[in-house]
């Protein structure tokens, strides 16, 4: 049995945890000569969508997790790649007492409140520990089933995406590895991760790694954590189906644009 020391905090304590998230992406398709002129642009676009910074604000029972927005370079235009890579995270609200999560997010100009019960995750403690900054962290794991996704944007998407949409979704087992610290006794963490006896400072999930870079306990400026209310309430299952529909539309738009560019090139 693993014994973990728990520090005591007052019930009204607050904190802020800053995280950086990175998704591994297959970029082998960029070696294709047809993409040579746009390689720099595509690399920048991929980085924008796979390397992000987030802020988790928390108290003893509630938390909100949102992206720290970066200034966009003028002329970047519509970020079509956001339809392919990563999670559609707007602002995730988690309430450990009410056992509910709400993702306040936007898609195609419309706001949604993606609402679901907090997952009763069957974490397994390994007994391993390590330090992350000044905090002693302990390892916990669990296995979940997710839809298999191939993060590539070249000929695979252009030629095969339509056929892929007609096939049944392939589910695979993915091991989630988390490192949490009982020094901060809140059952929360980045993204949707929660359910451990301490704040999660690091988590890896297949192609995604999220790492805490800074923690501020009891900041001078207190933030009141509020339950999101902006948008249409929708279940996660229905929202995922809507995402798939819009993603397919974005793919078709991209393919049409490629055909027009190819036709223009032949006429010159």
Map each language-model feature to its residues.
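Sec/Tat signal peptide C-region and signal peptidase I cleavage site
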Residues: 6-10
């Amino acid at each position: 049995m693993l014994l973990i020391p728990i520090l005591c905090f007052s019930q009204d304590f607050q904190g802020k945890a800053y995280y950086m998230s990175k998704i591994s992406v297959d970029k082998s398709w960029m070696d294709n000569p047809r993409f040579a002129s746009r390689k720099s642009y595509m690399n920048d676009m991929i980085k924008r969508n796979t390397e992000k910074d987030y802020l988790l604000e928390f108290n003893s029972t509630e938390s909100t997790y949102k992206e720290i927005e970066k200034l966009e370079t003028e002329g970047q235009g519509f970020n079509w790649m956001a339809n392919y890579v990563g999670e559609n995270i707007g602002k995730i609200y988690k309430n450990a007492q009410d056992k509910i999560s709400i993702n306040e997010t936007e898609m195609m100009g419309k706001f949604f409140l993606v609402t679901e019960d907090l997952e009763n995750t069957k974490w397994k403690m390994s007994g391993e520990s390590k330090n992350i900054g000044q905090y002693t962290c302990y390892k916990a794991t669990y296995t979940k089933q997710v839809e298999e996704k191939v993060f590539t944007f070249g000929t695979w998407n252009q030629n095969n995406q339509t056929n892929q949409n007609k096939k049944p979704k392939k589910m695979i087992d993915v091991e989630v590895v988390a490192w949490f610290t009982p020094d901060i006794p809140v059952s929360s963490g980045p993204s949707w991760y929660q359910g451990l006896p301490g704040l999660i400072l690091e988590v890896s999930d297949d192609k995604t790694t999220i790492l805490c870079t800074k923690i501020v306990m009891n900041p001078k400026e207190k933030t009141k954590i509020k339950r999101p209310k902006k948008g249409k309430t929708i279940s996660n299952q229905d929202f995922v189906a809507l995402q798939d529909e819009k993603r397919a539309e974005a793919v078709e738009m991209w393919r049409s644009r490629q055909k027009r560019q190819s036709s223009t090139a032949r006429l010159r």
